[in-house]
A protein has these predicted regions:
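Short, surface-exposed amphipathic charged segments that create phosphate/polyanion-binding patches used
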Residues: 125-135
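Active-site beta-strand termini and strand-to-loop segments that position acidic
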Residues: 7-11
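Cap/insert and terminal regions of metallo-dependent hydrolase folds
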Residues: 12-14, 18, 22-112, 116-118
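Short proline/glycine- and acidic-rich turn/helix-capping motifs at secondary-structure junctions
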Residues: 121-123
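Short hydrophobic/aromatic beta-strand or adjacent loop that forms the aromatic wall/cage
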Residues: 1-5, 119
Length: 135
């Protein structure tokens, strides 16, 4: 468990990039939450669904593989008071329709979220996220 994460600050804006970030099962990662505190955007490794990660509903478990889930990204974003959540590191087995479903679920939990896609540009000075590729 653990992750690499980077916080980039410039002209009063903050972006956190959290790659290959497997969450703890029993508690939030306090170091990650501290790093993300009040960031304008968090780019979070959301490679798996809950079923895939935990090995439920016919899936095999991906625990210990070094990746996380959208729901864990939402938890971090909420705990750290992040403005925007960008889900990335999509599993290669997930097609666009599958990612669209994950993004829709994420938006129900954290409205300012988007699934990353090639060419996505985020302007931290804007309050709203750009249009989703999956809308």
């Amino acid at each position: 468990n653990g992750c690499y994460a980077y916080r980039i600050e410039h002209e009063g804006k903050a972006l956190v990039f959290s790659t290959d970030c497997e969450h703890y099962e029993d508690r939030p990662n306090k170091n990650l939450i501290k790093l993300c505190q009040d960031a304008d955007a968090l780019i979070y490794d959301a490679q798996y669904t809950e079923d895939e990660y935990h090995g439920l509903n016919g899936q095999f478990s991906r625990k210990g593989w070094g990746h996380s889930t959208m729901r864990e990204g939402v938890k971090v974003a909420e705990a750290a008071n992040v403005d925007k959540l960008i889900l990335f590191h999509h599993d290669p087995s997930h097609d666009d329709n599958f990612i669209k479903q994950i993004e829709a679920e994420s938006r129900q939990l954290f409205p300012q979220s988007i699934a990353a896609y090639e060419g996505l540009q985020i302007d931290l000075s804007q309050n709203e996220l750009p249009k989703s590729l999956f809308d």
